[in-house]
Amino acid sequence: MDVKDGASGTLNDFIVDIKALGPKNGKNQDQQLFGIEVTGGSIVLGGDKLKVDLETDFIGGGNNQATAIDFSTSGSTAISAKQVDLTVASKAQNGKSVYGIAKSGNGTLKITSDVVNVNLSSATVRPANSEVNNDYSEIIGVDISGGSLITAENTALNIKVHSLATAATVDSLGGSSNKAGTSPVTGIKLEGGQGAFNGTVTVDVNAVGGSASAVEVTNYFYNTTLGQNYNDSAATVNKLQATASSKTGAASGILASYTKGSEVNSVILKVIGEADVTAETESGTAKAIAVTGQTTVEFDGNVTATAAASESAGTAYSIYTDAGTLSLQGANNTLNGDVSIKNASTLSLGNGSHVSQTALNGNLTADSGTTIELQNAVIDVAAGKTVNVATLTGSDAGIVLNQLDEGTLTVSDNKVKGLAVVASASANDLYADASEAAEALSKSIAVTNSSASGSYTISGQSGALSDGWTADEKGNITSRTTNQSLDVFGNYNAMTLVQWRNEVNHISQRLGDVRDSSATIGAWARVYGYDSSYDDNVSIDFKANSIQAGGDYRINNTWLVGGAFSYTDGEGKFTNGSADSDGYSLAAYLSGFFDCGAYVDFVGRIGRFSTDITAYSDASEFKGSYNNTTFGLSAEVGYHWKLNDTFYVEPQAELAYGFVKGDDFTGANDVRVEQDDFQTLVGRLGARIGASFADGAGTVYAHASVNHDFLGDADYTASLGSVSRDLSVDIGGTWVSYGIGAQFNTSKNLNFYGTLERANGSEYQEDYRYSVGMSYRF
């Protein structure tokens, strides 16, 4: 269909299906093949669908072409069909150039379709001595050489451009010329004019021997009709996914190039949203983002740039600049492949408004005369990769090294004030001590500060095993931050010891006051718990609730013997994680009450505690489970001294030993933990002062004790690979406990009792501890 001057209106649901076949032999076939050609007028291609399907085996070079839609008008045209499918296939080995959408002239093309699919292919393998006149050819999905092309925000533009050639000629190996070998392929090419792709753009192109470019912006083109042309070119893309591959030729995900002419032109590309750009080759050169000449390319969103060469003869660059300007301003960028900055180029990372993180999975080389600018930006250098920069500028900048070999970082002229050079968590974990890591980092870098403004600091990130630290330029440690996840584990380790220590209970808490009972058999049950905290580098809040039931038998007027079973459920919370634990224990006790008022209480205990813990650090998640078997013995003595028929004083002393058998386990971050056996030996001196109700109805009292743990060390070893650390937490020391209690005897055989208390001392605190029980004497 041909639309000329004066034409206007809307054409809905237009379908073109053309198969043009010609003689198999011949020097040239000048026929041009267009699905839709708009040379004038103003039309709208609308409806639900627009479909153009062209297939030809015509031969020809130069301007001979097969084009789905050609717009060369100076007017305004539009495509509004909901779905657009454009397919063009050239199957001749001396085939024509192939285009999906060709936009020239000074007019404007607006596309508001939901989906635009462009599929192009060519079988051209043209020898250098081709008999075809003006024998160049190319394949371009969307070609803009003048005017403007604008897509709507809802438009998804999908472009696939493929070479059907089975092999490349010798003339085309590694070359980018379109006059021999397989046709070069391009997804989107701006060689003049403006493109505003406000929706999403997905491009997939591949060539055999020719070059392949997913998106290309340039100021120059040549054809046999117009000759050499130099133009301003500018494009914006909202969201881009681009893949370019060539078997033996050059592959560029994004190519911005400049050819010097009689006038100065501008070449600008801006990607607003996220961009995922890939370039692949077997033996050619792959450049994910290539910026050459007086060109400017800017990415406002996150960028992933990947370049790969599958053979040793190939080379790959995630970024390649030669006299151009490239800016990556996204918060998270990933560069898979080497970075090469040449000939007065500038690479800028970040824009100062937010922290920009760039993962560099390749070597970065910035030659003399070039500049790397970091504005509130950090480069994270992969292990085994190096950075060699001539001039570094910016502010709030950092470089993180994941391997500390000599020569990893070289900056010839650092103009950044306070450049942070950091050993990553994984690199820091390779050293048993912070001083060793600091020394290795200082030897791995060679940073020369500008006399005017440059300076740098070195530090290490806290890893799965290592502490964080800072050091001077010579590697001398100036400050240290303990490993938060290991610190939490160590302190919670100690809380396990506290939990078992707290299972020691005074006789009045367990049984109430049974001194005056003459019943032979007793049964009792109680619930108890506490809310505690431990603050040493990290803060832990621990709550536990238990239920205990037991029974006893009075041997004679003095002695009774009994046993008990208890279950405990505990929960720990801390700023960087949480833990859950539960435990079971069995206890046997022997209690004696003497006529003089004295009493003794002996308890033996055995238990089992299980713990699940999760702790987070900047580097990793420490997650593990472990089990501890526990043993305990305690002895309490006291004297019940009646002041009169109502009031009494009861001094008390107690010694309790606890043993927690250590466990070994491996956390989710591969840190191996080997616990030592923990021990506690608590001495307690205290008293209670109370008043008894008339007729044996019960008692109320207040009590206070001074407690001291003579042991209380929780030691363990943490290891990662061949590196290990011996760590320890001391939960011993002195604390004071105090509270109130009461017992109510509702009958001769049934009584209820309870206590409420607090504890304070050193890093360990108890906001409250409660115990409520009942007993029945038969």
Segments from the language model and where they lie:
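C-terminal low-complexity, acidic/polar tails when present
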Residues: 143, 158-160, 212, 218, ...
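Primarily extracellular Gram-negative trimeric autotransporter adhesin
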Residues: 24, 163, 177-183, 221-225, ...
